[in-house]
Amino acid sequence: IGVLFSGGVDSGAVLLAINHELLVRGDSPARLKAFTLSVDGEGEDAKQARDFLRATELEMLGETISVARSRVDPLEAIQVIEDYKPLDVECAAVVLALLQGIRDDYPGWRYLVDGDGGDENLKDYPIEANPELTIRSVVNNRMLYHEGWGVDAIKHSHTYSGGLSRGCVRGYQPARHYGFRIFSPFAVPGVISVSEAIPFAELTCGSHETLYRLKGDVVASGI
């Protein structure tokens, strides 16, 4: 089992949970690897990943996949995911580079897990980056970042799931392209349902900083 690992909250929680479950089952942690991309030997993810693994005493799980900058190809990403939204294309381009590196090193590897959906579930996006948003509009709209992810509601359309389609495709299609099967525990209905029931307004009291801390507090409590 490979975790697409940045050392952040979402992929970190996934790695710790899978490692725990393997130990509970009596399986070897050697079945698990944390794959981190490094482009031209640079990037914050590789350092953050090393720091996380060191702090959790799981350094033996880490593996850095190093690629040349030319390997991160947005045009290839557009062809694979058949989409044009800049953030989704950027995400897919990076994932494709990482997955090609994993496939080159491990021709028989099949299963991958990532933390996609963690930001949406706990509204962990900078409000300041979008002039149309306010703290009130974010915390009072339970499906703001779950465009199409709703469990009991339809946000836009009965036939188009919007953000959910994009979220699935940007992970699923690159994985399929290289012969992997990928899964995110943050993108299943049960978890999304819990996230939509969180009383964000009451917990944050109108504070940006409190909202940004909330994700770490919730995930840390669960872990």
Model-predicted segments: where are they?
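ATP-dependent adenylate-handling active sites, centered on carboxylate activation for C-N bond formation
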Residues: I1-G222
